[in-house]
A protein has these predicted regions:
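Catalytic micro-motifs at enzyme active sites that drive phosphoryl/nucleotidyl and oxygen chemistry
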Residues: 78-79, 110-113, 119
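A short, polar/charged loop-to-alpha-helix boundary motif
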Residues: 139-148
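Short, flexible helix/strand-to-coil boundary loops that buttress conserved ligand/catalytic motifs
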Residues: 73, 82, 103, 144-145
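Conserved short beta-strand elements that form part of the metal-binding/catalytic scaffold
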Residues: 33-80, 122-139
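Generic beta-strand structural signal
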Residues: 87-89, 118-120, 128-130
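Vicinal oxygen chelate
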Residues: 9-17, 58-65, 74, 79-97
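Short helix/turn-capping signatures at newly exposed starts of structured segments
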Residues: 2-11, 68
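Core segments of cupin and vicinal oxygen chelate
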Residues: 4, 15-63, 98-99, 105-115, ...
Length: 159
C-alpha cells in the first residue's frame, strides 16, 4: 500500500513573486484573510544542505480549504517565473517519520529536511511535490488557519 494512502490534506502550497499582490488577488477571488506574512529567518536543510533562509510565508483558510503562500526565493524549492503558481500539497500523518522514510525508500527525493526528519518536502520521480507534516507542525498550521477563519468572520460581520 502507498504510504500516502488515506492521509489528510492540510493545505495547498502556493509560491508567488510578490506577496502583497498575490494576497490581494487571492483574497478577492477566494474571500481569504491572510495571517502572518512577516519575513523570518528559518534554519532549514534544503537540497541536503543546512541553510538559513529569509522567508515570507502567509496562511489563510476558507474553512473548507487551507492555503500556504510563500514568496519566491532563488535557488530553493520556492521558485517561480509566474505571478502565482500552485506549488505543493501538504499531507498530515501521525506517523510522519515512517511516511517520510517510506517515501525515500520509494525513490522520492527529499528537498526539504534532513534525512530522518519527521517532516519535509518530497518530489516523486515524475515531479509531484508533496509536503509531509506530523502532529506538532499540524497544530502550528491549524492555529494560523483558525486565526484566518476568525478574521474572515469578523470582516463578514462588519460588512
Amino acid at each position: 500500500m502507498s504510504p500516502l494512502a488515506g492521509l489528510a490534506i492540510v493545505h495547498t502550497g502556493l509560491v508567488c513573486q510578490d506577496m502583497t499582490a498575490a494576497q490581494a488577488r487571492l483574497s478577492e477571488s477566494l474571500q481569504l484573510s491572510w495571517i502572518d506574512d512577516n519575513r523570518e529567518e528559518w534554519p532549514l536543510t534544503v537540497f541536503g544542505k543546512p541553510v538559513s533562509l529569509n522567508l515570507r510565508i502567509a496562511h489563510a483558510s476558507t474553512g473548507v480549504a487551507n492555503f500556504e503562500l510563500i514568496e519566491a526565493v532563488p535557488d530553493t524549492p520556492w521558485v517561480t517565473s509566474q505571478a502565482i503558481v500552485q506549488h505543493h500539497v501538504c499531507l498530515h500523518s501521525p506517523e510522519s517519520s515512517e511516511v517520510c522514510h517510506s517515501l525515500e525508500a520509494l525513490g522520492y527525493q527529499r528537498l526539504l529536511g534532513a534525512a530522518g526528519d519527521p517532516q519535509g518536502y518530497f518530489q516523486d520521480p515524475d515531479g509531484l511535490l508533496i509536503e509531509i507534516v506530523g502532529d506538532t507542525l499540524l497544530a502550528y498550521l491549524n492555529d494560523y488557519y483558525e486565526q484566518s477563519q476568525r478574521a474572515m468572520a469578523r470582516a463578514n460581520d462588519a460588512a
